[in-house]
C-alpha cells in the first residue's frame, strides 16, 4: 500500500508544476496616452479621391453601329496571324477547339428575357464536332475557312473548351459577315 501512496503523490506534484508554468501575468491596467502623438485623421474620402486629371483621355464606347460580341470585340478584326496565335494559345493550354456559327444575330441581344445572363438569349450552331486531339492550329483555321465558304454571311467564333473542368475557357469572333 505504501507504494501506491507514493506514486499518487508524485503524480500530484507533476500536475501542479505543469499548471504553474502556464500561468499568465495579471492585468496591469491601461497605459497612459501622454507619450503617444495624437494626429487627427480625416475620414472623408471625397477629399482624396479624384480622377479629374484622367477624365480627358477616357472615351465612351459608341453604342450606335458597333455591337458588342465576345472576347476581344473591342479590337479591330483579327488578322490571320493573330487568329493563329490565339488558337495556338488555347492548344497550349490543353483546351479543345470548337467552331460555332450564327446566321442571324452574332451579337448580344435579349429576345425572351430582360435580365442579363451568360447566353443572353442566343444559341450558336456548332460546326461539325469539337476538334478533340487537335495539336496543329492550322487545322482549326482550315475548318474556319470551310465554315466561311459554306456560310459567308455568318458570324463565326472559335471557343476553347476544357474537357477536364467541363467549362468554356475562351471564346472570340473569328469571322464577321462582309455586310456587317
From Swiss-Prot:
CDD domains: RuBisCO_small. The keyword Membrane does not apply. The keyword Transit peptide applies. Residues 1-56 form a transit peptide. Pfam families: RbcS (PF12338), RuBisCO_small (PF00101). GO terms for molecular function: ribulose-bisphosphate carboxylase activity. GO terms for biological process: photorespiration; reductive pentose-phosphate cycle. RuBisCO catalyzes two reactions: the carboxylation of D-ribulose 1,5-bisphosphate, the primary event in carbon dioxide fixation, as well as the oxidative fragmentation of the pentose substrate. Both reactions occur simultaneously and in competition at the same active site. Although the small subunit is not catalytic it is essential for maximal activity. PANTHER family: RIBULOSE BISPHOSPHATE CARBOXYLASE SMALL CHAIN 1, CHLOROPLASTIC, RIBULOSE BISPHOSPHATE CARBOXYLASE SMALL SUBUNIT, CHLOROPLASTIC 2. Belongs to the RuBisCO small chain family. The basic functional RuBisCO is composed of a large chain homodimer in a 'head-to-tail' conformation. In form I RuBisCO this homodimer is arranged in a barrel-like tetramer with the small subunits forming a tetrameric 'cap' on each end of the 'barrel'. Heterohexadecamer of 8 large and 8 small subunits. This is Ribulose bisphosphate carboxylase small subunit, chloroplastic 2. It comes from Pisum sativum. The gene is RBCS2.
